Amino acid sequence: MAILSDKWIREAAQTRGMIEPFEEAQRRDGCISYGLSSFGYDARVAPEFKIFTNVNSAVVDPKDFDGDSLVDRETEVCIIPPNSFALARTVEYFRIPEDVLVICLGKSTYARCGIIVNVTPLEPGWEGHVTLEFSNTTPLPAKIYANEGACQFLFLQGNERPEVTYADRAGKYMGQRGVTLPRL
């Protein structure tokens, strides 16, 4: 597998709609950076958040997820309580080529503040908004800034198309829009 450069990412975004909307240059004036980088793309977090709460004394069960465990917020600044968690999504909609796997890494600006971003790989043939998981590992409230950088995606090209892509198997998160909760 080879990591793909800014030139390849730009061409795929502009001619195949791989990333929409697409920021052709890295933006970083007075904000957490986002846009095209040398070997990746820094995506933005949309102003749509689901913050975990314990007001209903629910148990988090990935096989039977209860949406009542979350509070919906549309805001430019999301405050995650201490040692808590929030779901969000990217501003960008991704369409992953059939011979590419995408890995996501957190932004160092957030990591240095104890805020961890987790995203599973974007599989060949998948498309949708990416649901982002933010963990506040600190004993203090933490801010997430909407419409600014949240994570970096690295694009890896395989030596051939896999036998079965995410689209071929009709994966359960195919075409997701908005913040998407766990599905079984």
UniProtKB/Swiss-Prot annotation:
Pathway stated in the Swiss-Prot or TrEMBL entry: Pyrimidine metabolism; dUMP biosynthesis; dUMP from dCTP (dUTP route): step 1/2
**Molecular function GO labels:** dCTP deaminase activity; nucleotide binding
Q: Does the keyword Nucleotide-binding apply?
A: yes
Give yes or no: UniProt keyword Signal: no
Q: Indicate the quaternary assembly.
A: Homotrimer.
Coiled-coil boundaries: none
Record-linked Gene3D superfamilies: 2.70.40.10
Q: Which family does it belong to?
A: Belongs to the dCTP deaminase family.
* Top-level EC class as recorded in UniProt: hydrolase
Functionally, this protein is described as follows: Catalyzes the deamination of dCTP to dUTP.
Active-site positions on this chain: 133
Q: What is this protein called?
A: dCTP deaminase
**Where, by residue number, does dCTP bind?**
107-112, 131-133, 152, 166, 176
Annotated signal sequence is none
Q: Give the reactions, separated by semicolons, that this protein catalyses.
A: dCTP + H2O + H(+) = dUTP + NH4(+)
